Swiss-Prot record:
The gene is Ly6c1. Disulfide bonds join C29-C53, C32-C41, C46-C74, C78-C95, C96-C101. The lineage of its organism: Eukaryota, Metazoa, Chordata, Craniata, Vertebrata. It comes from Mus musculus. GO terms for cellular component: cell surface; external side of plasma membrane. This is Lymphocyte antigen 6C1. A lipid is attached at G109 (GPI-anchor amidated glycine). Keywords: Cell membrane, Disulfide bond, Glycoprotein, GPI-anchor, Lipoprotein, Membrane, Signal. It is a lipid-anchor; GPI-anchor. SUPFAM superfamilies: Snake toxin-like.
Length: 131
């Protein structure tokens, strides 16, 4: 009976250690910036402070031509936004917090302003520069 209790305790401790070790490795997200929509983005391990994977798709309409770009990255926050008022720009951003969850923007994703997108992109660059 004492051996059974010891075995169960060891299994429980091992399970907790494995769960903690997996999270200590950090969230994994896809990462690329302003690339054509069909481009594959590599997977990266985020910093411990980054708890969200961000997926952003932008469609620019210039002279009746459409360009579709995407950004994928790790961030420490999920950016909030305001609807875009420019009819030549369509943008969708989503955030999630599971490994490699930012492969695509969900169809029901939120709409953000270009100003909000630029602000969060700029802030991530500034943070990376400072760190």
């Amino acid at each position: 009976m004492d051996t059974s209790h010891t075995t169960k305790s060891c299994v429980l401790i091992l399970l907790v250690a494995l769960l903690c070790a997996e999270r200590a490795q950090g969230l994994q997200c896809y990462e690329c910036y302003g690339v054509p929509i069909e481009t594959s983005c590599p997977a990266v391990t985020c910093r411990a402070s980054d708890g969200f994977c961000i997926a952003q798709n932008i469609e620019l309409i210039e002279d009746s031509q459409r360009r579709k770009l995407k950004t994928r990255q790790c961030l420490s926050f999920c950016p909030a936004g305001v609807p875009i008022r420019d009819p030549n720009i369509r943008e969708r951003t989503s955030c999630c917090s599971e490994d490699l969850c930012n492969a695509a923007v969900p169809t029901a994703g939120s709409t953000w302003t270009m100003a909000g997108v630029l602000l969060f992109s700029l802030s991530s660059v500034v943070l990376q520069t400072l760190l």
